[in-house]
């Protein structure tokens, strides 16, 4: 009988915890109007920021493609954002 009582108590506590969690989640979640306002404020909405992010992605992709095509360690270049040309130092570290 005590085991059944403990199981019912644990079930009730878990149910109450789930109910409180669901209620808190419903209170914290922004409404549709707030979601739209947040989307308008995102940095990707501004053309300059979008262009900058696209350029950065292009440079990163070009660097990764070059690194895949060569045996040189492009990570050791002083200016790895500029493309090609051997990097000036031979690709190695100097002591």
Curated annotation (Swiss-Prot):
**Superkingdom, natural source:** Eukaryota
Those parts of the protein on the Mitochondrial intermembrane side are 29-95
> What Pfam families does the entry give?
UQCC3 (PF15141)
Assigned keywords, A-Z: ATP synthesis, Membrane, Mitochondrion, Mitochondrion inner membrane, Transmembrane, Transmembrane helix
Cellular component GO terms, alphabetically? cytosol; mitochondrial inner membrane; nucleoplasm
Entries under InterPro entries matching the protein: UQCC3
Answer yes or no on keyword NADP.
no
**Region named Mediates lipid-binding:** 23-80
Q: Which residues lie on this side of the membrane: Mitochondrial matrix?
A: 1-7
Q: What is its main location?
A: mitochondrion
State which residue ranges cross the membrane.
8-28
The record's subcellular locations are: Mitochondrion inner membrane
Q: How does it sit in the membrane?
A: Single-pass membrane protein
Is the Transcription keyword given for this protein? Answer: no
What would you give as a GO molecular function for this chain, any one?
cardiolipin binding
Q: What about PTM?
A: Probably cleaved by OMA1 under mitochondrial stress conditions.
Q: Which GO terms describe its biological process?
A: ATP biosynthetic process; cristae formation; mitochondrial electron transport, ubiquinol to cytochrome c; mitochondrial respiratory chain complex III assembly
Q: Which PANTHER family match?
A: UBIQUINOL-CYTOCHROME-C REDUCTASE COMPLEX ASSEMBLY FACTOR 3
Write out the similarity annotation.
Belongs to the UQCC3 family.
| Quaternary context | Associates with the ubiquinol-cytochrome c reductase complex (mitochondrial respiratory chain complex III(CIII) or cytochrome b-c1 complex). Interacts with UQCC1. Forms a complex, named COMC, composed of UQCC1, UQCC2; UQCC3 and UQCC4; mediates MT-CYB hemylation and association with the first nuclear-encoded complex III subunit UQCRQ.
Q: What does this protein do?
A: Required for the assembly of the ubiquinol-cytochrome c reductase complex (mitochondrial respiratory chain complex III or cytochrome b-c1 complex), mediating cytochrome b recruitment and probably stabilization within the complex. Thereby, plays an important role in ATP production by mitochondria. Cardiolipin-binding protein, it may also control the cardiolipin composition of mitochondria membranes and their morphology.
The name this protein carries in UniProt is Ubiquinol-cytochrome-c reductase complex assembly factor 3
């Amino acid at each position: 009988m005590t085991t059944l009582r403990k199981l019912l108590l644990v079930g009730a506590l878990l149910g109450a915890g789930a109910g409180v969690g669901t209620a808190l989640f419903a209170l914290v979640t922004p409404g549709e109007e707030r979601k739209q306002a947040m989307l308008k404020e995102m940095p990707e909405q501004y053309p300059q920021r979008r262009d900058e992010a696209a350029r950065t992605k292009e440079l990163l992709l070009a660097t990764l493609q070059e690194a895949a095509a060569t045996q040189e360690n492009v990570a050791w270049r002083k200016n790895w954002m500029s493309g090609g040309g051997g990097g000036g130092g031979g690709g190695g570290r100097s002591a």
